[in-house]
């Protein structure tokens, strides 16, 4: 089975919000609600991974610039 392409963070968040809205209505049949919940869990994991990678990038950038001299811009 082909793996679904990874969504960008904003798209992931939007899709999660849409799933939550559908689940909150309480109108979904049980099996469909479970499928939506399963999809939401996967999206949360993707979002967390993206946030962790972003945090790592920020830490690397901060470490690189930790000893840089500050200069005034004209």
From Swiss-Prot:
<comment type="subunit">
    <text>Heterooligomer composed of large and small subunits.</text>
</comment>
<keyword id="KW-0540">Nuclease</keyword>
<comment type="similarity">
    <text>Belongs to the XseB family.</text>
</comment>
<dbReference type="InterPro" id="IPR037004">
    <property type="entry name" value="Exonuc_VII_ssu_sf"/>
</dbReference>
<dbReference type="GO" id="GO:0006308">
    <property type="term" value="P:DNA catabolic process"/>
</dbReference>
<dbReference type="GO" id="GO:0005829">
    <property type="term" value="C:cytosol"/>
</dbReference>
<keyword id="KW-0963">Cytoplasm</keyword>
<protein>
    <recommendedName>
        <fullName>Exodeoxyribonuclease 7 small subunit</fullName>
        <ecNumber>3.1.11.6</ecNumber>
    </recommendedName>
</protein>
<dbReference type="GO" id="GO:0008855">
    <property type="term" value="F:exodeoxyribonuclease VII activity"/>
</dbReference>
<dbReference type="InterPro" id="IPR003761">
    <property type="entry name" value="Exonuc_VII_S"/>
</dbReference>
<comment type="function">
    <text>Bidirectionally degrades single-stranded DNA into large acid-insoluble oligonucleotides, which are then degraded further into small acid-soluble oligonucleotides.</text>
</comment>
<dbReference type="GO" id="GO:0009318">
    <property type="term" value="C:exodeoxyribonuclease VII complex"/>
</dbReference>
<keyword id="KW-0378">Hydrolase</keyword>
<dbReference type="Pfam" id="PF02609">
    <property type="entry name" value="Exonuc_VII_S"/>
</dbReference>
<keyword id="KW-0269">Exonuclease</keyword>
